[in-house]
UniProtKB/Swiss-Prot annotation:
It is an enzyme of class 3 (hydrolase). This is LexA repressor. Homodimer. The record marks A113, G114 as: Cleavage. It comes from Cereibacter sphaeroides (strain ATCC 17023 / DSM 158 / JCM 6121 / CCUG 31486 / LMG 2827 / NBRC 12203 / NCIMB 8253 / ATH 2.4.1.). PANTHER family: LEXA REPRESSOR, LEXA REPRESSOR-RELATED. The keyword DNA repair applies. Residues 26-46 bind DNA. One of its GO terms (molecular function) is transcription cis-regulatory region binding. InterPro entries: LexA, LexA-like, LexA/Signal_pep-like_sf, LexA_DNA-bd_dom, LexA_repressor, Peptidase_S24_LexA, Peptidase_S24_S26A/B/C, WH-like_DNA-bd_sf. The gene is lexA. Pfam families: LexA_DNA_bind (PF01726), Peptidase_S24 (PF00717). The active site is at S149 (for autocatalytic cleavage activity), K187 (for autocatalytic cleavage activity). Keywords: Autocatalytic cleavage, DNA damage, DNA repair, DNA replication, DNA-binding, Hydrolase, Repressor, SOS response, Transcription, Transcription regulation. One of its GO terms (biological process) is DNA replication.
Length: 228
């Protein structure tokens, strides 16, 4: 049986992975559970791993994988959310493939996880993604990541990110941002008064700050695919 804090942490990790496609950082876990230090999170993570609910993968940032959920959490709505997502209408442009629960999404090109590069150019390729990875009823597309500025968020060079098309974002969302109408980048979004900060997840890079009118949100990260 899990303690209340262990349940809260597992719930938070699952919710953030459903939303962003990557686990939350230890700082985000600490804030979500209102703990004073990350050592408490380390203890909770270790307890969840020892009980077989999660698995930590070595030598990777934010490398947490959910192995199973307690029955109480399944009854509380995780299974219901899965059923609802599976029954939702297909996103515009998506094509059903033979693999159960999978969809083909257009692979629109490469996106910088580094300094901004030229705006995304679409191509004829597509990528197959789990249907459960798609959030809501909006249009989705995929991009190949170029660069290492988001590695602390678990996003590596060569990964495929799944993006839900939208023009707005909340603080902390990982977004595709179009800068000055011609440069695209994948960064964490922060609003600072009349300015927009695009934050990397790698200390080797600096946060980019632009006037609000120079930044257009093109979509939000909802999933990630990695080939080994």
């Amino acid at each position: 049986m899990l303690t209340r804090k262990q349940m809260e942490l597992l719930d938070f990790i699952k919710t953030r992975m459903d939303r962003d496609g990557v686990p939350p950082s230890f700082d985000e876990m600490k804030d979500a559970l209102d703990l004073r230090s990350k050592s408490g999170i380390h203890r909770l993570i270790t307890a969840l791993e020892e009980r077989g609910f999660i698995r930590r993968l070595a030598h990777r940032a934010r490398a947490i994988e959910i192995v199973k959920l307690p029955e109480a959490m399944e009854r509380a709505g995780f299974s219901a959310r899965a059923a609802k997502a599976a029954a939702a209408p297909l996103p515009k442009g998506a094509v059903t493939v033979e693999t159960a629960g999978a969809l083909d999404l257009p692979l629109m090109g490469r996106i910088a996880a580094g300094l901004p590069i030229e705006a995304i150019n679409g191509g004829p390729q597509s990528v197959t993604v789990p249907g459960m990875m798609l959030s809501g009823r909006g249009q989705h597309y995929a991009l190949e990541v170029k660069g290492d500025s988001m590695i602390a968020a678990g996003i590596n060079d060569g990964d495929i990110v799944v993006i839900r098309e939208q023009q707005t974002a909340d603080n902390g969302d990982i977004v595709v941002a179009l800068v000055a109408d011609h440069e695209a980048t994948l960064k964490r979004y922060r609003r600072r008064g009349g300015m927009i900060a695009l934050e990397p997840a790698n200390d080797s890079y600096e946060t980019q700050v632009y006037p609000e009118q120079m930044v257009k949100v093109q979509g939000r990260l909802v999933g990630l695919i990695r080939s080994y």
